Design a protein with these regions (language model features):
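N-terminal helix-turn-helix
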Residues: 2-89, 248-253
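Short amphipathic alpha-helical signal-transduction/dimerization elements
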Residues: 28, 151, 155, 159, ...
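Conserved segment of winged-helix/HTH DNA-binding domains
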Residues: 78-106, 134-135
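Short N-terminal helix-loop-first-beta-strand/juxtamembrane motif that initiates sensory/input modules
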Residues: 106-111, 191-194
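Short hydrophobic alpha-helical segments used for membrane anchoring or interfacial signaling
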Residues: 113-118, 126-127
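Short, solvent-exposed recognition segments
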Residues: 131-203
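Extended hydrophobic
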Residues: 175-247
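Short, highly charged C-terminal tails/helix-capping segments
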Residues: 256-264
Length: 264
């Protein structure tokens, strides 16, 4: 495994713990593509015997699962339980949920809440439209911030100097793949106060993103996704109006005072 640096606060990283986390993240990223022992050992650059021992430990504790032959590995059910506990314990998510319901009721479109995680956005809550099939996101999914309304709304809250160097991954022909193109788009986001994703993350889907400025810089955002086929100029203006109102309601809602922790 490559050498690891120091953790935050000057505390030296525990290699065994880091290896375990890297393995779980690798399996989670593979989704429905199970991995073989040698694949995992090669990916993390650790001896096959060490990887086997780690896998067996995690299988016994429910963090990793294996098939009936014992040769394929995937993420286990305890990862789901931990993720659910994260959502249930987060005061921001709990506070935002009723307003997502209101926006969904008013618009009949898909509404999301997401949080910036490095260069990605993690989806924390979704209200699906009853008018069309599922779009690109579900709770727990991560997408690169540069290719969606949620991510661009949050990137616009930060200086362009923090943007990573390109080229960026493209999901569609409309995705920004250069730092310069993304920065130009973010300048427009700052001017208008919300982001627009016109088929940059998924063909046929337009998104409108609104950063929630209860933190500085904003860590969370909400968005509305709508099929191009349903989007008229009048419909677009209605979506923007409702989502602006929703953002204002969320930002002016008093924070929880029942001993909730303010996480960083």
């Amino acid at each position: 495994m490559p050498e690891t640096g120091s953790a935050s606060g000057g505390v030296r990283e525990v290699k065994s713990a880091a290896r375990t986390v890297e393995l779980l993240e690798l399996l989670a990223a593979r989704g429905d593509r199970p991995a073989r022992l040698q694949e995992l050992a090669d990916a993390l650059e650790v001896p096959r015997s060490s990887m086997y021992a780690l896998l067996q430990t995690l299988v016994s504790r429910g963090w990793v699962r294996t098939d009936v032959t014992g040769s394929l590995y995937g993420i286990g059910i305890h990862a789901l339980l931990t993720g659910t506990a994260y959502l249930d314990s987060d005061p921001r998510v709990r506070a935002v949920r009723p307003y997502l319901d209101e926006a969904s009721e008013a618009l009949g479109e898909t509404i999301h809440m997401g949080r910036l995680d490095g260069h990605d956005v993690a989806y924390l809550a979704t209200r699906e439209s009853h008018e069309y099939l599922r779009t690109i996101s579900r709770v727990g999914r991560r997408l690169p911030a540069h290719m969606g309304a949620l991510g661009k709304a949050l990137l616009a809250e930060r200086p362009d100097e923090e943007l990573p160097e390109g080229p960026y991954e493209a999901a569609t022909p409309r995705t920004h793949t250069s730092r310069e193109a993304l920065a130009a788009d973010l300048a427009e986001v700052r001017e208008r106060g919300y982001s627009v994703d016109r088929e940059e993350g998924l063909p046929g889907i337009v998104g409108f993103g609104f950063a929630l400025r209860y933190d500085t810089p904003a860590q969370d955002a909400i968005s509305c996704s709508v099929p191009v086929s349903r989007l008229t100029p009048e419909r677009e203006q209605r979506i923007i109006t409702v989502m602006r109102e929703t953002r204002t309601k969320i930002e002016t809602t008093p924070p929880p005072t029942n001993g909730s922790v303010h996480w960083r």
